[in-house]
Amino acid sequence: MNENLRTEDTYFFGHPKGLVTLFLTEMWERMSFYGMRGLLVLFMTREITDGGMNLSAPEAMAIYGIYGASVYFLCVPGGWVADKIFGAQRTVLYGAIVITLGHYVLAIPSDKTFFLGLVLVSIGTGLLKPNISTIVGELYKPGDLRIDSGYTIFYMSINIGSMLGFLVCGYLGEKVGWHWGFGAAGVGMTFGVLQYIFTKNSLGNAGKRPNLSDKEDINKYLSTFKYASAILILFLVTGFLGIWSVDAEFL
């Protein structure tokens, strides 16, 4: 290994210290994501007496499909927001906070908060997911051969987080109560947010600034972002509610 590398650049298994921050953030985000996702269809199709929503399988799968599609669809504007407005570091933080709020809203036992929670998690994931991987790449200088192994280590966090989510949220959701499982996802994401806030200085300038220097351009993009956000939120809400047809007993 190059002896000229700074100590902080080899902190984590020979990799930059900031990789620890991103590893743990991704781990907790994936824990909350897969933990909650594993409960969705089961919760929606269970009888009301079992704490569920008593939806039919087609209705539940339709909602699940819209949620899954919206998560990946929102990654496109999420990347744009980081690139043009906030920078990747702040966008990841804002996304993590919105995800956390979404999980806690899901933990409230109400049909209305269920759909609101899904919308929040979708938006937050769209902000976080495309940008955290970008920051990983920016931790390394051009030509640094460690970048491939750095991504390998980073992607291990996805496997660890998903396993934790299925074990913790799955157990609490089925054995204790559905909303306990959703709440556990929120607690996990809270850990992720806190550790990101307290250790994000280790990221240095990686993903810190958007690719804009002109203040007028920034204001223009902020204005566009506000209108686009309103349209996206309206689309998600009407999409979820449009397929939610339940009988009078449930209402």
Describe the role of every protein-language-model region.
Residues Y94-F115:
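C-terminal ends and interior cores of transmembrane alpha-helices
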Residues K84-A96, G143-D144:
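Cytoplasmic membrane-interface "Motif A"-like loop-to-helix N-cap segments
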Residues L127-P142:
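Intracellular juxtamembrane helix-capping segments at the cytosolic ends
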Residues R37-G38, P77, I160-V176:
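A gly/Pro-rich, aromatic-decorated transmembrane alpha-helix motif that marks the paired
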Residues G38-E59, S245-L251:
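Short amphipathic helix-loop junctions that connect adjacent transmembrane helices
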Residues M27, G102, T113-L128:
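Hydrophobic core of transmembrane alpha-helices in multi-pass small-molecule transporters
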Residues M61-A82, K129, M163:
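Central cavity-lining transmembrane alpha-helices of secondary-active solute carriers
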Residues M1-H15, P142, G170-L251:
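Intracellular loop-helix junctions on the cytosolic face of multi-pass helical membrane proteins
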